[in-house]
Amino acid sequence: MSGNFWGIDMAATAPHHHDRQFEIHEDIRTEDTEMMVEEERTEEAGPNEEDEHVQHSHVHQHHHIQHHNPQQQQHHHVQQQTHAAQEEEEERVEESSEDEAVDRGVQEDMDKLQSDFPGFRNRYRLIKRIGEGTFSTVYKAEDIMYDHYDNSWDYEDDSSKWTPPPSAKPSSPVQRPRRKARYVAIKKIYVTSSPSRILNELELLHDLRQCPSVCPLITAFRHTDQVVAILPYFRHGDFRAYFRDMTIPEISIYLRELFTALKSVHDHKILHRDIKPTNFLYDPTTQRGVLVDFGLAEREGSDNKPCLCNESREVRKHRQANSVWAQNSTNPQPGYPKSDTRSSRRANRAGTRGFRAPEVLFKCTEQKTSIDIWSAGVILLTIMSKRFPFFNSADDVDAMIEIATIFGSKRMKAAGLLHGCVFETSLPTIGQGGFSMEKIILWSTCRGEDKPLTPDEKMAISFLESCMELDPGRRITAEEALRHDFLQLGEVESDKRYYDQESADQY
């Protein structure tokens, strides 16, 4: 599916992952989210954004186990065909119900999209809207011209699924199921989005096209002022439906998939800026996930100014000693200086409330990939506490208060000084020392002393504390996280699950 975006050939943007597969299934809608975009872009942003959906499942390819008994292999092959036929029939029923469920307003929008792009109806058949946000709307569509283009982005191997090895073909013909439809997610980007924002997202997706667990860009089209991006249609579950029932090994697998994606992104010096459950599409059945929505992503250092957090300790002490706050500390006066000659600080504050790192709230002007690690830590805290959302602040001040309630005012003051900010509060609910993550988890899950944490749970909390370190310089990296003992649990459990499934499939 070749296309052209402002003269940029986007036909070769998809990865050639021959060691992975994915299946395309029904989408599950998730919740609305509110985006906090940077001050420089407030004219573009709206108050609420519903996460745009694309669905996914990755299945790692392992060594194929040969069947030495031809009759057993024939029986196994027939079982595969029967199961696939059942899935196909269920998919046709689901698709039929989807078509009936589209309301008139959505149908009008879909008809307009198809009419705005010449030849659109010959390539795609829109089925329904699966996401709507501040900057775009996402639709599920059938790829009518799938067989006419290079689909190396599609990890599914139909020939291996339907046809057994030549030496073991069944003697009697077996009816081949109807080839199931191929779906894509079509992201229509609003004309209110700046061209630079659109181009930035597509360029980043192009750079990440070979990365595991990252949603690839198939192609993109522009007609006059209308821009659409074509993405794979990935399967995932609703985070709210499964996160409370996850076991520690399952949590480890989930986080391992997420940090695999983060490592790929961070290796390219890219900040995602919007890590949250609805932007990491995870399928609990296959235990595979994919990172999506790079609308707020940017390259590290693209808009940086020096910040104290990256200076030496001696330089920070010198700057703090000569600050306005230090000069007034002997005789502090309430309020703000009447004639403040200091220039206002402007920094990127993009992200979703409840998932933004402390340095984003403190307006750090030199933000790095560590902001994504904090957000991943919030996801882990959400899962272990069984509370979603865990942080539910309405603005930056409330967000800092929520964090200070856990970490204590002393550590929050130190975190603020790292970025040249002063954190002061007189709220009685915020203590000096804060609370340990272990206590937070026990209180949130209503567990008493009769139900102490298991060794695996303590390992998970240790990993959580490494992710939610207030000092971004001391926060764990994605590469280090993948070597952590907690995420190694997920690798062992995933391998065990695979070999158990292989053994079951032989019989």
What are the language-model segments listed below?
Residues 127-134, 138:
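Protein kinase glycine-rich loop
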Residues 184, 210-219:
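Conserved HxN/HPN-centered segment at the entrance to the catalytic loop
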Residues 224-238:
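Conserved short submotifs of the Hanks-type protein kinase catalytic core
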Residues 266-283:
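Catalytic-loop of the protein kinase fold
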Residues 301, 453-454, 465-507:
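Regulatory extensions flanking the kinase catalytic core
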Residues 332, 336-343, 409-463:
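C-terminal lobe substrate-recognition/regulatory segment of protein kinase catalytic domains
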